[in-house]
């Protein structure tokens, strides 16, 4: 779990990025001092080195929520358009699952 010092450095870096200011150890330390955050002196430099050459704004906007695969359905939708109506009919046949009865599985509630 991240410590309060780490989180404070992350927030300071995000503030600097939002203001479109270069992220340096000195600027992170200045923000932390202005916010009266107690921190070890190595944290600002560590975060500045980690974010050196990284486009933080692009990094934030490209983070996925992990909810699903966005590009895969778009690619699958493009394939039937190029192939015609025949592949679309085949996918409908594959999507129909075979229904199974719970009776023959032996999972009765009151058995």
Curated annotation (Swiss-Prot):
Gene: rplp-1
GO terms assigned for molecular function: protein kinase activator activity; ribonucleoprotein complex binding; structural constituent of ribosome
InterPro entries recorded: P1/P2_N_sf, Ribosomal_P1/P2, Ribosomal_P1/P2_euk
The species this protein was found in: Caenorhabditis elegans
Region ranges (Disordered): 65-111
UniProt superkingdom: Eukaryota
Keywords in alphabetical order: Ribonucleoprotein, Ribosomal protein
Example of a GO biological process term: translational elongation
Cellular component aspect of the GO annotation: cytosolic large ribosomal subunit
Keyword Transit peptide listed: no
Keyword Ribosomal protein on entry: yes
Compositional bias ranges of the Low complexity kind: 65-89
Protein name stated in the entry: Large ribosomal subunit protein P1
């Amino acid at each position: 779990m991240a410590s309060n010092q780490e989180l404070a450095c992350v927030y300071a870096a995000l503030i600097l990025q939002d203001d479109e200011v270069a992220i340096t150890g000195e600027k992170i330390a200045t923000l932390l001092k202005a916010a009266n955050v107690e921190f070890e002196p190595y944290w600002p430099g560590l975060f500045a080195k980690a974010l050196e050459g990284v486009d933080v704004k692009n990094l934030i906007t490209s983070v996925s929520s992990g909810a699903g695969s966005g590009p895969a359905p778009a690619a699958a939708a493009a394939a039937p358009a190029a192939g015609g109506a025949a592949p679309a009919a085949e996918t409908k046949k594959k999507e129909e699952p075979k229904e199974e009865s719970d009776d023959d599985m032996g999972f009765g509630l009151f058995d």
